[in-house]
Amino acid sequence: MLKTTSIAAAAAVATAVSFGAVQAAELKLSHQWSTSDVRHKVAEIVANEVAAANVDLEIKIYPSKSLFKPREQYNPLTRGRLDMVVLPLSYAGGQQPAYNLTLMPGLVKNHDHWSRLVESPFMDKLEEIMAGDDVMVLVHGYLAGGFGGKDRCITGPDDVKGLQTRAAGKAFEQMLAAAGASITSMPSSEIYSAMQTGVLQAANTSSSSFVSYRLYEQLKCYTPAGDVALWFMYQPLLMNKTTFDNLSAEQQAALKAGAAKAQAYYLDEAKRADAASVEAFKKAGVEIASMSNDDFTAWREIAKTSSYKAFVEQTPGGQELLDLALSVE
């Protein structure tokens, strides 16, 4: 009798544990970067805040492309096979052409400008499109980039004429080609060797890539993101909307609180990355150039007849979206 009671008690405990395990939800979060990257830290802040809230919710982060390939993350997110992801939204521009506007020259002037842009009707419209794919934004964030010249400084459009140039993104390639550059496409990891062998004379990439790939060893001049910059890429933390809606009110509140903290960190760290890149290039003896407001305006005029024109032609409702983005001061 005692043995039977013990077995029954053990079964009851096992059932309780099992029930508890079911109640404590686990969310899978994927991204492509290392655990030292700012985008991993953003994910980690949200995960840690949710854990500290003690709301029976755990976020398991899969960094370094360990769950999905970078450009293959959006579809699983829309289908609920993946709960959360940090990614450049333009990676999903094939599925939703409107997303290509989040990697477009001259739409974002500086970091404070993007913090206004994400609170504008432009972002509301983008989020409507995401909602149609069962996707929502938890954390907004843009990262900036600059220009590097092998033999000379690049600030305005005239500076790239005749140069073999690598650009970060199709829209930037279109604009640079319109300015007279010859485009050489390659991942940022190949810029160093291309410059070393003379294949490349100029490049456009993110502030962090300029440093992590030690491009200061190849460049004569660096034009970083400063008071104005041409290259900004939207890289948010997204979540499957149905997954979020199915969470308890307490779990949703914990996620939102963590997201608010992460977004403030993201903005600060994005600015810090730009400043850190300048210090690295100065230390290496590379000349530092600045893009003026006149330079920015000149680039934007070229973008209007190249990148912007192509976007509007290829995107349903593209003109409305572009106008909304350009209206944010």
Mark where each language-model region is:
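Bacterial N-terminal signal peptides that target proteins for export
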Residues: 1-9
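Sec/Tat signal peptide C-region and signal peptidase I cleavage site
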Residues: 19-24
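N-terminal secretory/targeting leader peptides
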Residues: 9-12, 25-113, 119-329
